[in-house]
UniProtKB/Swiss-Prot annotation:
UniProt record similarity statement: Belongs to the BolA/IbaG family.
Organism of derivation: Mus musculus (Mouse)
Phylogenetic lineage: Eukaryota, Metazoa, Chordata, Craniata, Vertebrata
Protein's recorded name: BolA-like protein 1
PTM annotation (Phosphoserine): residues: 81
Function description: Acts as a mitochondrial iron-sulfur (Fe-S) cluster assembly factor that facilitates (Fe-S) cluster insertion into a subset of mitochondrial proteins. Probably acts together with the monothiol glutaredoxin GLRX5. May protect cells against oxidative stress.
């Protein structure tokens, strides 16, 4: 059974985009999120592009755009290894990864793979932060 979130994304396949907000998300995408979405759409012509800003779950200021999770579904991934798929995503986002983006979790799937499991994975809780918050000095 599909969750409401997955059902929304399946409906969104017709428009090739899926609106998603993480714990740091707001009603409108920030400039980094917008750039990531535009660059992946241009580079990969995805059938599904689901992007979640997960910065709010990390030790960063409110409203940050530093930690993202993306599910990108493209026929361009056919016949490629997971490493090759991730390299395509990294190539498209080289500016963001060299600057404002600290972490990017990637699910790069073919359309057939997405149909088998049409959902964006959930990240585990952040265990990072300053050394003082981890109990060391």
């Amino acid at each position: 059974m599909l969750s409401a979130r997955s059902a929304q994304c399946m409906v969104s396949m017709a428009t090739r985009s899926c609106v998603s907000r993480g714990s740091a998300g707001s009603a409108a995408a920030g400039p980094v999120e917008a750039a990531i979405r535009a660059k992946l759409e241009q580079a990969l012509s995805p059938e599904v592009l689901e992007l979640r800003n997960e910065s709010g779950g990390h030790a960063v200021p409110a409203g940050s755009e530093t930690h993202f999770r993306v599910a990108v579904v493209s026929s361009r991934f056919e016949g490629m290894s997971p490493l090759q798929r991730h390299r395509l995503v990294h190539e498209a986002l080289s500016e963001e990864l060299a600057g404002p983006v600290h972490a990017l979790a990637i699910q790069a799937k073919t359309p057939a793979q997405w149909r088998e499991n049409p959902q964006l994975d959930i990240s585990p809780p952040c265990l990072g932060g300053s050394k003082k918050t981890r109990g060391t000095s």
